[in-house]
Amino acid sequence: MTNWATLWPNDRLFLSDTYQLIWFDIEADRIEHKHFKAQNSEDISMIPKGFVSFVDNRLPMCINHKGEVYIRVGSFDTAYYQKFGDLDVSDFDDQVLPPDRDFTFNKVVFGDVPQEQLDNQIRDLQSEVSILTSRNVEMNVRENDLLKKVSELEKQIRQSSHNYEKVVEDGVVLSYRKAGGLLNRMVVLNRRLVGQRFVTNQRRWENIIMGSGVHDGSSYMAFNFKESGGSLKVTFDFDKLQNLSPDDLLAMQIA
């Protein structure tokens, strides 16, 4: 495909403020959307830098080699180019224009835009604002949902790093203690808390206390029992263990 920049200079070829090349099919003060087309060129080096620096960071507009300046009005399919005037480009060479350069227009032809056209532009802009507002609301809702999910995941991660879960089976040991040279432990047997003492000379554990039954929702020290997936499970909560006071421990009953 031909790079339109190679056609410069040409009366109908214009350089826009976005460095697009604009081609006018007709010569008129007002160029409707159907009478112009644009091309994105990766190489506009053949266009003098004076023209390139003139359009840089300006309002939506375009200029040709003769200095004819057109202002872009509207957007999308309703956009058109309206001639603003003829700029003196006699010294536009391949040097970048100084930032304080003054520009002289030989003729200004840009007049008032018809009220009907202004009304159409206002409606188009209002429609765009409505669409953007709707999208912004959707994005805010989506963002809130994602933040909630992140918060839930962080909570699960914290819990998983501070808890240990195991299926309750006979013989699950919950705690050990040693007092007066005797070794004791708390286990679960037949879904009951059972205190046991180690008989040293017989090398076996014997039951000394039959405590309360364990079920979904019951607890013992830092252990919580719950039904899950058809099984009774016990969860050890490190955070809860850290927060138990001596009074809490003394008040605990297993019978």
UniProtKB/Swiss-Prot annotation:
Kindly give the Pfam families that the UniProt entry links to this protein.
Tobravirus_2B (PF05271)
Subcellular localization(s) per the UniProt record: Virion
The record describes the protein's role as: May function by interacting with a small, flexible domain located at the C-terminus of the CP, forming a bridge between the virus particle and the internal surface of the vector nematode feeding apparatus.
Report the InterPro entries cross-referenced here. Answer: Tobravirus_2B
Instruction: Give the family from UniProt.
Output: Belongs to the tobravirus protein 2b family.
Q: Which GO terms describe its cellular component?
A: virion component
Q: What's the domain of life for this entry?
A: Viruses
The yes or no answer to whether the keyword Cytoplasm is present is no
Could you list this entry's UniProt keywords, alphabetically sorted: Virion
Q: What is this protein called?
A: Protein 2b
